[in-house]
């Protein structure tokens, strides 16, 4: 409103100069106080504007820190992955080594068991063979003794008869596995008499 109403300016005269010289002291004090009052407001507005700018635009340092954090997390994740893979590989190799060792031990154990089974079977087989051979030998010997006893009885009988008839008896025999071949020659006064006979054995298999 004050700008629209022009005021008439009076040209200063020489008489008014001393009054104008005295007035600046009072005016300077008022202007200085007004300037001092306005400066804090300007400072406050500048700080608020700077704060708004800071809140709107994050500083480059924070961006760098966030980038560093992401890179660090990536490196840590990679290192953890390598550690886990290394541990898994070590565990797999250890398991493979243990399996190979256990397979070798099992093969040795099975080989020993087979060897022991073969030895036991061979011992049993040999024992059975020896028992069978001993039994056969005992049976044949007993039959041989029976035949020999019979031959001796026959010889004694013929000797007694030859003595009674004043003759002479001569004979021979041959024993095989199944029968007895007997051949007797009796010499009497009337003439020789030859007797041959085959006596089979009753062998039960």
From Swiss-Prot:
Compositionally biased tracts (Basic and acidic residues): 1-24, 51-68
All residue ranges annotated as the IQ domain in the record: 68-97, 124-153
Keyword Isomerase included in the entry's annotation: no
Pfam families: IQ
Record GO terms (molecular function): calmodulin binding
Primary site of residence: cytoplasm
Protein location: Cytoplasmic vesicle, Secretory vesicle, Acrosome
A GO CC term assigned to this protein in UniProt: acrosomal vesicle
Subunit organization: Interacts with calmodulin.
PANTHER family, A to Z: IQ DOMAIN-CONTAINING PROTEIN F1, IQ MOTIF CONTAINING F
Function: Involved in sperm capacitation and acrosome reaction.
Protein name, as recorded: IQ domain-containing protein F1
């Amino acid at each position: 409103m004050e700008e629209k109403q022009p005021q008439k300016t009076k040209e200063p005269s020489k008489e008014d100069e001393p009054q104008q010289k005295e007035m600046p002291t009072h005016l300077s004090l008022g202007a200085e106080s007004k300037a001092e009052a306005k400066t804090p407001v300007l400072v406050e507005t500048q700080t608020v504007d700077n704060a708004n700018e800071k809140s709107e635009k994050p500083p480059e340092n924070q961006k760098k820190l966030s980038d560093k954090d992401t890179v660090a997390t990536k490196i840590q994740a990679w290192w953890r992955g390598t550690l886990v893979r290394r541990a898994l590989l070590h565990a797999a190799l250890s398991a493979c080594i243990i399996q190979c060792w256990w397979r070798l031990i099992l093969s040795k154990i099975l080989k020993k068991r087979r060897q022991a089974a073969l030895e036991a079977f061979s011992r049993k087989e040999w024992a059975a063979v020896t028992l069978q051979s001993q039994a056969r030998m005992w049976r044949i010997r007993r039959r041989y003794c029976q035949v020999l006893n019979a031959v001796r009885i026959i010889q004694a009988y013929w000797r007694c008869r030859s003595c009674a008839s004043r003759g002479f008896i001569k004979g021979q025999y041959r024993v095989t596995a199944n029968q007895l071949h007997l051949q007797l020659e009796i010499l009497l006064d009337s003439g020789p008499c030859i007797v041959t006979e085959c006596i089979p054995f009753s062998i039960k298999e």
